[in-house]
Amino acid sequence: MKPLDDPQHDREVGSRDSTLDTTRIDDVRIGAVRPLITPALLQERVPVRADTLALVEGSRAAIAAVLHGRDDRLVIVVGPCSIHDHDQAIEYALRLKVVAAELQDDLLVVMRAYFEKPRTTVGWKGYINDPHLDGSFAINEGLERARKLLLELTLLGVPTGTEFLDLLSPQFIAELVAWGAIGARTTESQSHRQLASGLSCPVGFKNGTDGSIQVAADAILAACAPHAFMGMTKMGVAAIFETRGNDDCHVILRGGKTPNCDDAGVAASCAVLRAAGLPEQVMVDVSHGNSGKRHEQQIVIALSLIHISEPTRRS
């Protein structure tokens, strides 16, 4: 039996180019259609025990406690830009776990486990989309690898955070995620705001690529509200989802045309949140626009944040 990701498997009526039917006016730019594993089947292949889910639930509750001022620790999301190798991710997690335990009285450490990469133009779109990094787009395998890694990280006792980019991928992995992010390119997207309103984990919205904080504040207000939208169930059936809203959302300052990670940037961001009637809680991204994409600047920025006044530096 051919695997689901076999390039010759079940493309519409069996032909690789069956969708290129010149007599039709629909799907004329679709080169091929392959089957996608259902979330329910993947959950059956990679099951999660109740005690494992309890670890995720506890991590989410701890992060929410920080966001709502019931815990005075700082939430720190740290890790590689994106996941591309399972074994390297596990090795990193084992080292991070040791440091996180040492700092647990002051910091709530979450490991960054990003499987999807938004691109400004084109490029590798992440571990789920192309797990072999060769353009084979073995998406079913990528989903399974991502789920297995999240499960293993959780079993190690390491909470994970990821960016939700594709609107279907949360159905495959979200119950193993302690904290989620909506990126700068999608914060203004209505679909992603609706998605965040139904996610079970705390969610951070990045400011816009131009540095706009208002975009992120608007996103939080939208995510706090109930929504109804189309989606896919765990059984792979199209459905209408009605959400209750997510009040565990916050802003991520990632810079824009200029950095916004200093005292003035944080204060200005808090002013926008205050005007919107939102909690003045921000997380600072020490990379991207704040670092000028120079990794050596990340430590400098992190150290500078220590000196920001206590009421404005909680994340």
Question: Can you describe what each PLM-predicted range is?
Answer:
Residues L67-H68, A101-Q104, E152-G157, L273-G277:
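Acidic (Asp/Glu)-rich catalytic clusters
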Residues I30-L67:
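N- or domain-start disorder-to-order transition segments that initiate the globular core
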